Amino acid sequence: MEIQLWRSILCPYELAVRELIVKFEHIISEHRENDLYSPIEQVSGRVKSVSSILEKMQRKHIPMERMEEEVEDIAGIRIICQFEEDIETVASLIQNRSDMTIKSEKNYLKHVKQSGYRSLHLIIYYTVETLNGPRKLQAEIQIRTMAMDFWATIEHSLQYKYKGDMPPHVAERLTNAEIGRAHV
């Protein structure tokens, strides 16, 4: 697919990421301006790279014409909280918004991955206004604590270092460290 076509596909997702970041940053600001504790510590986002989209489509056997329906995380938002209790508070804030609709949830807090990875992933529908009118897009929102984010970064780096074939002794040490962290 040519570069210009990819730009036109990804442009609305870039808009969605920018708008969502602004909305979540506004939640932080509103809480702080009113001397309230904000359940959101920080927010970031990204649009998945073309190579990552193509790799995922190949791995999951997704045809090009189904890309926007089946690759749910082209737009990604990460919300970092201080405490685990804040995660459900943030999920409720999202649930109660009129500009976002939750499509699905993957709860890696209740169903911790074998590696020890923990997070709450929400797939939402979000509408952006484009030159051609409104576009309803999907975005993935990952909600986790600072400790969980640190953990996910280390785990991802190790998976990358070992090219997805992490030695059992490293995986075991990683899992044991997460068990210890979870009890702190």
Regions found by a protein language model. Name each.
Residues 68, 81-181:
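Long beta-strand-rich cores associated with HINT superfamily self-processing modules
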Residues 1-72:
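Charge-rich, low-complexity segments
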